[in-house]
């Protein structure tokens, strides 16, 4: 079942993912992590800009949506998608590494967990730029500012090195493989 040290106490708000075992480290080093290495490919950074532009055009094309609301919806949609993709889902959809990444989110898998790499910096700065643009184009409306800043914090806080491999309120429990939900203590 597991040792008592890996059990989450009921009063704990933050749990820490255990350090990888020697077997996990060997499995992680045995093959390329296809789940997260795409962020270093040519065009991977551009697709974020294309997605933001497409979201902006889609929301602007809806007749009842104002320009200000279109920017806020673009911001919220991109931030929610980014949060789910990088910080909510754990594991990999591929079985190539013996389950070495099953407890890690995609953000924790990026660049083998190294901090301050170019890809991580880009993915950290892009939401800030989108927030600044959406705040500017909403003409600094107070309510939209609060919504946009909340979305920014929800995406930026999990990216900080201080919360690397930590789970706040135990919310990241979604695994990509159904057979792993019972076998891995989270």
Swiss-Prot record:
Coiled-coil segments: none
Alphabetical list of Pfam families matching this protein: ORMDL
Membrane protein topology class: Multi-pass membrane protein
TM spans (from-to): 43-63, 69-89, 143-163
GO CC terms of this entry: endoplasmic reticulum; endoplasmic reticulum membrane; serine palmitoyltransferase complex
Top-level taxon in the UniProt lineage: Eukaryota
Official protein name in the record: Uncharacterized protein C119.09c
Main location: endoplasmic reticulum
Subcellular location field: Endoplasmic reticulum membrane
Gene Ontology BP, a term: ceramide metabolic process
UniProt keywords, alphabetically: Endoplasmic reticulum, Membrane, Transmembrane, Transmembrane helix
């Amino acid at each position: 079942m597991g040792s008592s040290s890996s059990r989450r106490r009921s009063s704990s708000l933050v749990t820490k993912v255990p350090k990888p075992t020697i077997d996990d480290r060997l499995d992680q080093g045995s093959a390329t992590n296809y789940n997260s290495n795409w962020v270093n490919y040519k065009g991977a950074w551009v697709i974020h800009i294309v997605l933001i532009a497409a979201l902006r055009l889609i929301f602007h094309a809806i007749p009842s949506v104002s320009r200000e609301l279109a920017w806020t919806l673009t911001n919220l949609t991109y931030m929610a998608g980014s949060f789910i993709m990088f910080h909510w889902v754990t594991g990999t959809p591929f079985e190539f590494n013996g389950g070495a990444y099953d407890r890690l989110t995609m953000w924790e898998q990026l660049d083998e967990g190294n901090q301050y790499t170019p890809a991580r910096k880009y993915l950290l700065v892009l939401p800030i730029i989108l927030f600044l643009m959406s705040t500017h184009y909403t003409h600094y409306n107070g309510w939209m500012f609060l919504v946009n800043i909340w979305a920014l914090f929800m995406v930026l806080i999990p990216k900080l090195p201080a919360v690397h491999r930590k789970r706040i309120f135990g919310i990241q429990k979604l695994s990509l493989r159904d057979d792993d939900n019972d076998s891995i203590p989270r």
